Amino acid sequence: MQLKLKGKGVIVTGGSRGIGLSIAEGFAAEGANVSICARDPIALEAARVQLSAHGSIVHAERCDVSDANALELYLSAACEALGTLNVLVNNPSGFGRGDDEEGWQKSIDVDLMASVRGSWQAAPQIEKAGGGAIIHVSSISGLTHSQRTPPYGAIKAALNQYTKTQAIDLASRGIRVNAIAPGSI
C-alpha cells in the first residue's frame, strides 16, 4: 500500500490474535517496527514469529494490561526496543465479563483504564517523535444496545467519549486520536 511507515514505531496492546494481530500485521507489512503484548505466552510467541516474517523489528512481551505497573514497564520496554513511538493502538479486551461487581471492575480495568494509562504514557513519546496517532479499539457495543454483556458496552461507550476529549486535548501536540468500532466477528 505504501503508507510510508518504514521504520516507524508502533505498539499494539492485545496484539497476539484477532483484531490486534491483524492490525500489527498490517503495520509490519508496511515496514513499521512493531511491539505487541498479550497475556498468553504461546499465542504471543506465535504472533512474534508471524510478524517477524516482514523483516521489521518485532518486540513481544507478556503483559496483563489491567495491571498498571506491568503496563508501564511493558510500554517503557517497547519504546526502548522500537527506538521511537509514532503510533499506539490500544486493543485490550475484556469481552464476556459478568454483570456483577467483579465483571464491571475487570471491564473498567481492561477496556478503559488500560487505554487511558497507555495513552498517558505514550503521548509524550509520540510528541517527542514529531507526532503520530493513538487509536483506541472500541466496539459497536459502545454505540448501540448490547444485551449479552452490559459492562462491555458501557465501558466501550466511555472509551468513545474519552477518545473525543483526548482528540481535542492532544491535537495541538501533533497527536491524532481516533477510535474504531468493529462489529461482531
Segments the model singles out, each with a brief description of its role:
Residues 41-42, 62-74:
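The beta1-alpha1 cofactor-binding region of Rossmann-like NAD(H)/NADP(H)-dependent oxidoreductases
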